[in-house]
């Protein structure tokens, strides 16, 4: 038996009493483990194996990197309460988990991303803005996804200071001197451009608070969604759920505002 550290990305029932647990492990990358009997009513495994929990367990990796690994006994587990209590925070954690799972190959060494996701979960549990934490992952995952926009400088002139916009044609930012070269640039405000550039390089350990306006947050999400929709073609179910949730929230806000207006 081996002690394995990991983050649970998702679980699903297997046969009557077992669970398949998708885990980002610290040393072995993405793996799927079988937890026998975890669905039985009195199983200690079943209550502990929750998505986004960070755990150490006794078990085994898949033999010859094929098939399933096994979870025999949990040694330690960290469950983030805010992710359980807040459906929006949980949804953004699920989005990050899905993106990591769909970006990398099975068994690929991902210690850096393991540490990054642990930090991300901690920041979410501390109450930092969940959209922004997810946006940072979305931006930084573009590199392993093979898109890697150039956020550093204008590729034509090398200019790194000044006014910029995002250009899909040039796969990154272009300076205002070259706006006429791309009629389909996204026409972003400069705060949005600033944060896009920062998010591409920022270390989550540096973030202790987030104060970004709703207008800028919408701009950031618009760019990120544009890249994922048009240049990658990747949209996890968690992303669709988040969009639906925000649509419901906006409908409720409008309903309340209209109701208050009529009551006057």
UniProtKB/Swiss-Prot annotation:
Keywords from the UniProt entry: DNA damage, DNA recombination, DNA repair
GO biological process terms, semicolon-separated: DNA recombination; double-strand break repair
Keyword DNA damage among record annotations: yes
Pfam short name (any one): RecO_C
GO cellular component: bacterial nucleoid
Family the UniProt entry places it in: Belongs to the RecO family.
Function description: Involved in DNA repair and RecF pathway recombination.
Record NCBIfam families: reco (TIGR00613)
Name assigned to this protein: DNA repair protein RecO
């Amino acid at each position: 038996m081996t002690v394995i550290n990991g983050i649970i990305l998702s679980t699903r029932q297997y046969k009557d009493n077992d669970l398949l647990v998708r885990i980002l492990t610290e040393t072995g990358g993405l793996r799927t483990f079988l937890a026998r009997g975890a669905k039985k009513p009195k199983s200690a495994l079943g209550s502990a194996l929750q998505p986004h929990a960070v755990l150490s367990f006794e078990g085994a990796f898949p033999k010859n990197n094929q098939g399933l690994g096994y979870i025999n006994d949990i040694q330690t587990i960290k469950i983030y309460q805010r992710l359980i209590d807040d459906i929006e925070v949980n949804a953004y954690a699920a989005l990050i988990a899905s993106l990591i799972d769909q970006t990398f190959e099975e068994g690929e060494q991902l210690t850096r991303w393991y540490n990054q996701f642990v930090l991300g979960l901690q920041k979410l549990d501390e109450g930092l803005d969940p959209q922004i934490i997810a946006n940072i992952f979305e931006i930084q995952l573009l590199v392993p996804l093979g898109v890697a926009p150039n956020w550093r400088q204008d590729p034509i002139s090398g200019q790194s200071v000044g006014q910029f916009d995002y250009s899909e044609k040039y796969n990154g930012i272009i300076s205002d001197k070259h706006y006429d070269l791309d009629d389909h640039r996204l026409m972003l405000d400069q705060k949005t451009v600033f944060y896009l550039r920062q998010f591409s390089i920022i270390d989550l350990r540096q973030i202790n608070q987030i104060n970004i306006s709703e207008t800028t947050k919408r701009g950031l999400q618009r760019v990120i969604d544009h890249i994922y929709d048009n240049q990658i073609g990747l949209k996890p179910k968690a992303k669709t759920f988040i969009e639906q949730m925000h649509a419901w929230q906006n409908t409720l806000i409008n309903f309340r505002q209209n109701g208050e207006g009529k009551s006057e």
